[in-house]
Amino acid sequence: WSGWLEFHGQRYEFDRDMTLGTKDRSWGIRPLAGGDRRGAPALPQAGGLFFLWAPLHFDDFCAHYQLFEDTKGRTLFSVGALLPVYGSIDALPGVEDPTVTHCRNLEHKLSFASDSRMIESVELAMTEIESGNRVSIDFEKLFTFRMKGIGYSHSEWGHGMWKDEVAVGSEQWDLADIDDTAFENQHVQHLMRVRIDGNEGIGVLEQNILGPYEPYGLEGAIKPPQK
């Protein structure tokens, strides 16, 4: 990624050789507050959500880990893969690259803060489908990005909320005052230093864990883990 952002008179420059990112997929039309009510209907609520997503960048490859589980820890949806790196957009093949290594059996081992559901440490793993090789991913947490800042669970600037033709606003929070037990702060991304088989890279671990989740003894809607 390259370009710049300006906020309250301070300009931030981004160099493509130093700035890594992930472009999310298009989700099509969604029935969001105040906007177009068409689109796929919402799924019936099953009493909880356990979601982990980790796009990870290394010098010579990328890794992708995405997992939805139900309250008992049963897999609802998963994607795991090791992917090649391209030098430019023009180098993209236009079809799925045959060198992509698809994975299954996504695993996780999480530990949480003592007073909230914020992940403090994590180990992930997945198994290559063709070879059966188990890929272990080690993480070192650097800091936490609040998804509320881009509209998720925000009461006024909700993600995709219709605000008429033009609406501009800004907001600031003192991160030291953030309440990690509040509902609107449960959806976060942790910037991580990551390692796979001696390769060191950078990426994020996104978490959204709501409702009970038996494997980690989580109860209630957003109740912290039991001590």
Q: How should each PLM-predicted stretch be described?
A:
Residues 1-227:
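Structured soluble/peripheral alpha/beta segments that form catalytic or ligand/cofactor-binding pockets
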